[in-house]
Amino acid sequence: MQGRLQPGGPVVLVTLACPAHGVSVERTGDGPLSLEGDPLVVSSAQAAHMLDKVGLPVAGRYVISADLLPGGGAGMSTAALVALARAAGCDDSAALARACLAVEGASDPLMWSTPDRLLWASRRAEILQRLDPVPACEILGGFWGPPQRTDPEDSDFPDIADLVAAWPGADLAAKADLASQSAQRCSSLRGPVDDPMPELGKRLGALGHARAHTGPARALIFAPGTVPEGAERAMTEAGLSDVLRFATGGGA
């Protein structure tokens, strides 16, 4: 979910954790700061800023590997900054959060060990509330449309205070429905109007759907073991690219 906590309130989110995918960074040597990798999800200037903000030397050779689309709304830029700083020697989650905010102006809570158990103020890098674990589920995801980087000055999101209030203690079906409501409010306010996920979810028997509120990432939420045969093909036929399937929640 993502939106405003009351009209005029902070932009908040509950992230969808994807433990099977992300960014890896390896420090391969000393010397002046040097980045290699394909795709390169963080610029040299951003890397230098990040290292400086966590109090580490702006130096070293790093290889960065991301296995999801940069600008896709899957948190790859934040993940890259966090992985870079950890490879350089910083593992202080609060310091990493502050540094990511300074570099990007907005961040995902990926520096924390259980990011999907946080109500996160993304433009403040603050934990507003600790939440209950997400029940075990299967996600069928992909990307619908071109990459779109987050604009930290963009706060034109719907009010989701009622959805946030209903989240604690909700079971998987109820949480999936809350995610669907958040996605639908975002699409109604910001577009696109032809998002295929609500209808696709109904056709495939998903409990609900989720979307990146900036970026093309989309997901269907299923109870474990209930993704139907041919679902990946149906996603591709609906126009999604890089379709992937993973388990999350329940300690996954």
Residues of each region from the PLM?
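ATP-binding N-lobe of GHMP and related small-molecule kinases
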Residues: M1-G71
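Conserved active-site and cofactor/substrate-binding residues in soluble primary-metabolism enzymes
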Residues: C18-A20, V41-A45, G75-A79, P158, ...
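Generic beta-strand or strand-like secondary-structure segments
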Residues: H49, K53, A80-A83, A87, ...
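Short, surface-exposed acidic
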Residues: P57-R61, S93-R98
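DPxDG-like acidic metal-binding loop motif
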Residues: G72-A94
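ATP-dependent small-molecule kinase catalytic core of the GHMP/sugar-kinase superfamily
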Residues: A94-H209, I221-A252
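Conserved glycine-rich beta-strand-loop-beta hairpin in the small C-terminal domain of fold type I
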Residues: P216-R218
